[in-house]
Amino acid sequence: MKPFGYSYLLDMYKCRVGAADDLELHYRFLEKIVDEIGMTRMSQPTVIHAPTSYGVELYPEKAGVSGWIPLIESGIQIHSLEPTRFITLDVYSCNKFDINIVKNFAKKYFEFEHCSEHYIERGVGFDNK
């Protein structure tokens, strides 16, 4: 049975200094990764400094950026922690995509030293006729 969708989870460690707190870098990454993997945007990315509540920083030790871009095929989200230079990326799509393209593109943008990754077939019991 064909899966409903596919998730690729990429955890990036020891990213380039400043990358995990760079709002514009995250925005450009989300905007361009869509084309790299052949997906279709539903809107422009939403990217914010986090964690904040109406502009007030709540947890300085977790300072960073969170972002999301909705896709016709599903969505991509990213979260980062500047104090530890850690960035997480989740790509979810109803269509198959090349995870090596995602990983290499992320490496170019965030210059991580090492990473961990998981690829998951979602909805394997879904009757996708």
Language-model regions: role of each:
Residues M1-K129:
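Polybasic/polar functional segments that serve as interface/processing modules
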